[in-house]
Structures are given as C-alpha cells and as structure tokens.
Amino acid sequence: MTNELKGRVNYSVNGNIAILEVDNPPVNPLSSGVRAGLAEYISKANEDDSIEGIILTGAGKSFIAGADISEFGQKSDGPDLHTALKDIEFSKKPVLAAINGTALGGGLETALVCNYRMGTNKAIVGLPEVNLGLLPGAGGTQRLPRLIGPSQALKMMLAGTPMSAKKALQQGVIDAISENSLMDDAIAFLQEKIGSETHPKVRDKNEKVLEARGDDNVLAEAKALAAKTRRGQFAPGQIISCVEAAINEDDFDVGMKKESEYFLECLMNPQREAMIHIFFGERAASKISDIPKETPLLPINSAGIVGSG
C-alpha cells in the first residue's frame, strides 16, 4: 500500500480463510488508505483459489468507528467508500464481519455489506450520523431496514445512540456473539457456512420492507418520533425519506441513489456544519492540556453571567 494514503489494511491467511484487518489507529476510521486496502485485498482473496472465505476485523479495540469526517468536503485518493463496499458485497467468497469493538456509522455500514456478522460480547454498533446533521450515506438507510425491519431501523437511526451486542443480536443486526476468542469463533462460524451454495446479501432481503409497504403507520410513527426528539433538525426528515424509498422502491439501486441525493442535501445544509463544529469542539474540550488526569469532577451548584451589561 502507498504511504501517501491514510490508514491501511493488514492481510493474513489462516488455512483457507483470508483475514483482513483494518489498521488505522486509534479507532480505525474508513480513511483513504483503508478503502484502498479493502478493495485491494478483497480482490486478492477472491483471486486466490486456496481461499474459501474472508474475515474482516479491526486492529486494537475498534472494528471500524465510521467514516473519517476530517475528509468530508476534501478530495482524497483511492476508491470512494461506495466502491470499496460494493467490492465486499459482491465478493465471490463469503465475508464475515468479526466486530471486535466499536462499529459505528460507516463501520456498521461496512458490516452490513458482509454476508455474516459476529461480535464480541462488548461490541457496540450504531448509526449516529443524525447527531452530526447527516444520514447514513453508505447504504445504511437501505440495508438496515431490510435486515431488521423499517420500524426498528428508523428508531435506531433517529436515536443515533449505540447498541450493545446483546441487543444487536436480539434485533438481528448481528448473527452471533463470541464469548471466547473472536477470531477462533469467527473462523469456526465461517467454516460452517463455506459449504453453503448461497450466502445471503442484506440488499436481497426484501421480506421486511415488503411487509411495511402500504402500512402508513411505519412512517407516521417515525415522523412523530422525529418531531418529539429532533425538533427543528433537517437530517431526520431525510432519513425518513430514505427509508420510505427502501420500502417502496423495487430496485435497491434506486433507493441507494436517493440516499446519496438526500445525503448531499444534508451535507450542504448549514445545520451539518454547525453540528460537526460542535462535535470537534466537544472533543477538543475533553482534551484540554495541563489538567492532571486525577483532577476530580465537581458539581456545578450555581452559575453567573459575565458581561451582560
């Protein structure tokens, strides 16, 4: 991999299984080098006749924390995220996402293009883009409703809060939880699936969206929830419109196109810039220099306004 790209993917082989490890510390965002590495090594595994399955995981304590928002609005080298994810989704060999920690935003969207998903008991998944004035723009609004149903998907995306592995398993976001060695369990799980003639793609799971077609309550309840919890925000309405497309469009790619259009509208909306500014500001404030780590938190009992005239 070229050193000019940010982040990388490590490639190793265990028997007939190729292991792709996203390595972009500290939280493994989907930076340019990661996207390039995914595209390169998915292709390599598919071209190797000795490889029968692929495991995608993350280095350290995070699977993939999401998109690299520092690249938003900037030209970057390497394949775009949609291209890299499409390579995974249409892999000739089955792909399992071994979620070793945090899988948020683009991280969960990456797991959703894999055929199977397994997490540790401490894994965290979620689509928090709404908190940045955005919507899940890498297929999350189209795949998640197909996997767990439009109603649950809307609640998850509008809340923007992380979900535990236990709840993710209950709702069907992941297929299994590893209680021991994630890699050992992932290899064993995938070995059982290798002999299957077909390996499910989330994009092809239409039963739940077809069940919601014609049920006005699904979208009405989501709009009521957004009005209550996200009053005045732009992105929630766009998320609902995306899921409406997932429900009503017969062609998955048409829904994806609408998601891209609505994502761009969110990206250009002033709210997005303000909310991302707040996000970076809060992160910076939490890392104020010269404050000892042992400094205790103190309650605020009163506050005064200075310079009010």
Q: What name fits each language-model region?
A:
Residues 1-57, 79, 83-86:
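Conserved CoA-thioester-binding segment of acyl-CoA-metabolizing enzymes
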Residues 57-87, 103, 131-134:
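Glycine- (often His-adjacent) and acidic-residue-rich active-site loop
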Residues 2-21, 65, 109, 113, ...:
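Amphipathic alpha-helical segments at domain termini/boundaries
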Residues 296, 301-309:
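Glycine-rich adenosine-cofactor-binding loop
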Residues 141-151:
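Hydrophobic, secondary-structure "cap" segments at the distal end of domains
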Residues 88-132, 136, 307:
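Glycine-rich beta-to-alpha active-site loop
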